[in-house]
Amino acid sequence: MGEEAPEEYELGGGEDERVMEWETGLPGADELTPLSQPLVPAGLAAAFRIPPEPGRTLLDVHRASAATVSRLRRASSSSSSSFPAFASKGAGTGADEAESGGGADGGNGNTNNSSSKRARLVWTPQLHKRFVEVVAHLGMKNAVPKTIMQLMNVEGLTRENVASHLQKYRLYVKRMQGLSNEGPSPSDHIFASTPVPHASLHDQVPSPYHPHPHHHSYNNAAYAATVSSYHHYHHANH
């Protein structure tokens, strides 16, 4: 059996295909057991009736190495592309923001890994405008993260994203009403990009009670009639 591979045979493209960090700590060529030497001595193999292994050549080793390198490269490339970039539905989201989750995922990757990695979401003016419209529709008091997320219907948007933004938005509305100095500044480019609807401002601060004028007149007339009846009864019995 030959010990050398044909000169024209190359391991997946030669030196360019070598991954040097995978070779760190491996024994050198002079430290390896020669291919011609069996791992089990002949006497021991005969005693235990172990059939001899077929001989291996350098060509066999190169083929096995090429197959291993190919499998490792495929596994590495598939794992790096399994978490795709975030794409929003018509609302223009960006790449990152602090909660994440789930976020920045884009179209054709393996969704099984999306729960273990949460990219961060950027609130753009378009996405914030959609958020404001949904909050105005629900009413500030009734707006909760889960319902907002469902009505916005934006791919990659998580409940945590919405909860954080809703908290900031409520502080922003209070600041616009002059009730607080906390929250985003009125000049914040995201929050200022969409004016706060009048209904949201009105909903945040309960209006004082004002009795209806007709109701007020009715009460006065009823009181006057009661007093008149009392005086008439009092004079009739004296």
UniProtKB/Swiss-Prot annotation:
- DNA-binding region(s): which residue ranges? 115-174
Q: What induces it?
A: Circadian oscillation with peaks at subjective dusk.
Does Isomerase appear among the keywords? no
Give the source's domain of life in one word.
Eukaryota
- Keywords from the named record: Biological rhythms, DNA-binding, Nucleus, Transcription, Transcription regulation
Record's Gene Ontology CC terms?
nucleus
- State the Gene Ontology terms under molecular function: DNA binding; DNA-binding transcription factor activity
Which residue intervals make up region (Disordered)? 71-119
Query: Low complexity bias located where?
Result: 71-90
Statement: the UniProt record of this protein carries the keyword Cytoplasm = no
A Pfam family reported for this protein in Swiss-Prot or TrEMBL: Myb_DNA-binding
GO BP: any one term: rhythmic process
Its primary localisation, in coarse terms, equals: nucleus
Q: Where in the cell is it found?
A: Nucleus
**Compositionally skewed regions (Gly residues) per UniProt:** 100-109
Give the function comment from the record: Transcription factor that is essential for the generation of the circadian clock oscillation. Binds to specific sites on CCA1 promoter leading to CCA1 activation.
Name of the featured protein: Transcription factor PCL1
| Organism per entry | Oryza sativa subsp. japonica (Rice)
User: By which gene is this protein encoded?
Assistant: PCL1
